[in-house]
Amino acid sequence: MSQAVKIELRETLKEKPDTSQLGFGKYFTDYMLSYDYDADKGWHDLKIVPYGPIEISPAAQGVHYGQSVFEGLKAYKKDGEVALFRPDENFKRLNNSLARLEMPQVNEGELLEGLKQLVDLEREWVPEGEGQSLYIRPFVFATEGVLGVGASHQYKLLIILSPSGAYYGGETLKPTKIYVEDEYVRAVRGGVGFAKVAGNYAASLLAQTNANKLGYDQVLWLDGVEQKYIEEVGSMNIFFVENGKVITPELNGSILPGITRKSIIELAKNLGYEVEERRVSIDELFESYDKGELTEVFGSGTAAVISPVGTLRYEDREIVINNNETGEITQKLYDVYTGIQNGTLEDKNGWRVVVPKY
């Protein structure tokens, strides 16, 4: 029997939102998981507390020097049963990110148990509609109140929950417009591109805003050395379908190792598609398009799962992929992947982790 996590109960519970108007990241549940770290006693006081503001020092090192990492995963409900999707992979990546920023690693099993108990307490918040889920955001930041660049001796970990609606607002995938960034870079090898650190996202915002002003949804980043090889999209890994083969840039230390990316690769192979992980230059991609070999492009990530790319612009040239329609392989992967997530298709890989009732 797992040890129960201490719970500090609220006096009153929130009114739950209309599930037809959820959107993404707008509403938060009644409770959150809290965990503190001090250098002299390690991680301690794992507990579930009411969701609300927290108090930190104005000199908290995480605010000044950027020691802050996060994760994102989801829980799904079907016929009253709630299941997490590959949470072990998220906590492994969380520890990799923590190590890169010289932050203390967590006990993955202990944290997963705490998450299960939190989600069980909040299971009434898990929406059950088509494409809906409970978004889960674990994050860790430095809290020691002292100035001076150096690793903090104190940290706080929180996990907050947000009921979220269908990403596309309906059953049809909507192709996105992508702008290839050729001035700014996201990351370089030896840096923090492989880690899910807050600063990576802050550094991407200027290019993202510029792309939005030009009418594009997201930015496709090139490598930080030659600005020649494709790496990833702002919030997604990227895939290409050429002559029926599924291709994605190989992990090189500057690309985030997405859990959705990893799962899509495994799933595509299981479905009989040839999958190739390798370097892909932007010039090669456009040449493949000109030859009629590039038939589909899609991104993968926790929020959208799979997002087809309909338009791609690089320098002064814009191409339209598959007549701006979702490709056959893209749709197949999306249907099977989401079917496994929400429990309507068999989970042959053991990716779903059912949340017990404590």
From Swiss-Prot:
Residue numbers carrying N6-(pyridoxal phosphate)lysine: 196
What stretch or stretches form a coiled coil here? Answer: none
The record ties this protein, via NCBIfam families, to: ilvE_II, PRK13357.1
EC number per UniProt = 2.6.1.42
GO MF annotation: an example: L-valine-2-oxoglutarate transaminase activity
Mark the transmembrane ranges.
none
The entry sums up its family as follows: Belongs to the class-IV pyridoxal-phosphate-dependent aminotransferase family.
Q: Gene that codes for this?
A: ilvE
Please list the GO biological process terms of this entry.
Answer: isoleucine biosynthetic process; L-leucine biosynthetic process; L-valine biosynthetic process
Disulphide bridges in this chain? Answer: none
Q: Which pathway is this protein engaged in?
A: Amino-acid biosynthesis; L-isoleucine biosynthesis; L-isoleucine from 2-oxobutanoate: step 4/4; Amino-acid biosynthesis; L-leucine biosynthesis; L-leucine from 3-methyl-2-oxobutanoate: step 4/4; Amino-acid biosynthesis; L-valine biosynthesis; L-valine from pyruvate: step 4/4
Keywords per UniProt:
Amino-acid biosynthesis, Aminotransferase, Branched-chain amino acid biosynthesis, Pyridoxal phosphate, Transferase
The entry's protein name is Probable branched-chain-amino-acid aminotransferase
User: What reaction gets catalysed by this protein?
Assistant: L-leucine + 2-oxoglutarate = 4-methyl-2-oxopentanoate + L-glutamate; L-isoleucine + 2-oxoglutarate = (S)-3-methyl-2-oxopentanoate + L-glutamate; L-valine + 2-oxoglutarate = 3-methyl-2-oxobutanoate + L-glutamate
